Design a protein with these regions (language model features):
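N-terminal secretory signal peptides that target proteins for export/translocation
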Residues: 1-14
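Residue-level detector of alpha-helical hydrophobic segments embedded in or interacting with membranes
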Residues: 3, 28-29, 77
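N-terminal secretory/membrane targeting signals
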Residues: 11, 15-18, 193
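Bacterial N-terminal signal peptides
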Residues: 16-30
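Sec/Tat signal peptide C-region and signal peptidase I cleavage site
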Residues: 32-37
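Small-residue-enriched, tightly packed secondary-structure blocks
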Residues: 38-245
Length: 245
């Protein structure tokens, strides 16, 4: 030990080597983290796709969703939010992630899913908490075009009307001229769900991770320049329902 200490040159070289090892390890960690983060985002996105398919099937089976089934064939797009969380005591707010599929008017084929978030805030004498499965039927080209932007405000950039709510609670009479019709299944204490004023925003991080490159909603929904085979079940489920199968 004394000999090592008395050899300052050898000690300095050893310290340099250790420093280089630590530097390389740090650089490797920085190069790995983004890839790991992207893999995690892709896995979360796929989980949302799987849940969206189950939520879509739930609404199809619900006896209160007659309007939903009747108007599905006329939809230009479908935005599925498997879990919209809402909690309030005097101030209410809601939020959740969802997937949007658009229909090709010529072929009838449904696009790959694009990922979005849906969020809103409300004020009023509301009490309770709920988690709702929400589906928005995009009924007009204007509604689809509005969703191609990075963000849109429901009721402003595109009109929205409430459809029937599950669990035996009926929503307001649907305005069939609206750009978007909303349908929900809920077991909470709220009598219904109003999306007037809600903001819909594209989830660029999940879109990029799911398709392995930087993409816009336009690329996914209209240009159809990307694909992911793991979305096949969801697209097939929506397609069969529209065709009445």
């Amino acid at each position: 030990m004394k000999e090592i200490i008395k050899n300052p040159l050898g000690h300095a070289i050893m310290l340099q080597v250790m420093g280089l090892v630590l530097l390389v390890a740090a650089l490797l960690s920085f190069s790995i983290l983004p890839a790991e983060a992207e893999d995690a985002a892709s896995a979360e996105a796929q989980e949302l796709v799987n849940k969206a398919r189950l939520s879509f099937q739930s609404l199809l089976r619900d006896p209160n969703m007659t309007w939903f089934r009747d108007h599905l064939k006329d939809a230009k797009g479908v935005l599925i939010v498997p879990q919209l969380l809402k909690a309030a005591f005097f101030v209410g707010g809601s939020g959740g992630s969802g997937v949007l599929l658009a229909r090709n008017e010529k072929t009838g084929e449904w696009s790959e899913p694009a990922f979005y978030t849906l969020g809103s805030g409300s004020f009023g004498l509301q009490f309770g908490a709920e988690a709702s499965e929400v589906i928005l039927l995009v009924m007009t080209p204007r509604g689809v075009e509005a969703l191609l932007t990075s963000t849109l405000k429901l009721g402003g950039d595109a009109s929205v009307a409430i459809g029937p709510v599950g669990g035996g609670v009926q929503g307001a009479t649907a305005n069939l001229s609206a750009d978007i019709l909303s349908f929900a299944l809920s077991k909470g204490l709220f009598a219904g769900i109003s999306l007037e004023g809600a903001v819909v925003a594209a989830r660029d991080d999940w879109n990029n991770a799911y398709y392995g490159k930087a993409v816009r909603p336009l690329d996914i929904l209209m240009n159809r320049s990307v694909s992911n085979s793991h979305s096949a079940e969801l697209r097939a489920t929506v397609g069969k329902a529209v065709d009445g199968k």
